[in-house]
Amino acid sequence: MRLSRKLTLLPLLLLQPAIMFGQDAHALAGKVDQRYNRMHSLEARFTETYTGAGATRTEGGTLLIKKPGRMRWDYDTPRPKLFVTDGNMAWFYVPGEQQARRSPIKQLDDLRSPLRYLLGKSKLEKELTGLSIASNAKPLNAGGVVLRGVPRGMQDRISETLLEVAPDGAITRIRVEELDGSITDLRFLQQKEDVQIADRRFRFTPPPGVEVVQGTELVN
């Protein structure tokens, strides 16, 4: 799967548990907003599983987020690769390759786009249209609740996004299903808030001799 076929939201609990805890989609979205709007930075381990075209691929690494607008996906399993943005320009590079790809962040066609609400002050209900409790989706973690919606502006590509939300409002999983039937499943572990992250971690300079290619889809 392509990094541009990733992206970025998370699952929450079934309808019955949601009712039991007195939660609805609006209240749950508010809890998520409150958590991430007060946060300045985040570090987490992630796993990403892509299923499509008769194949399944699982990758993993470390995610760094720092406001405003900066994000770094450092893949280390099964091979190193990097997706990074400083808030203006996004880069994708695989060590050892002869090309690095870049795109202005506003032009980027990437499934990570729903994660932009984590990068500034925003509201989940504005980022996802048709936001509701996914009563037929089983959460992976105890006490979790699953939300369903479609990222605004991506209705021509994505049929459904599920977000799993922990009782404290943390997003622990994002599952994105595209119109072609492919599925990207992102899970976030060992989340650390407001950690010190140097600004240089979100800048990228291509190694000598590496060609820079411009495009809106960065990752294969």
Name every feature range the model reports, one short phrase each.
Residues 1-10:
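Bacterial N-terminal signal peptides that target proteins for export
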Residues 9-18:
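Bacterial N-terminal signal peptides
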Residues 18-58, 206-220:
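N-terminal leader/targeting segments and the immediate start of mature chains
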Residues 39-41, 58-60, 66-68, 78, ...:
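Extracytoplasmic
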Residues 62-114, 184-185:
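An acidic-aromatic
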Residues 98-145:
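Flexible, surface-exposed loop/linker segments and immediately adjacent secondary-structure boundaries
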Residues 126-216:
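Gly/Pro-enriched, hydrophobic low-complexity segments
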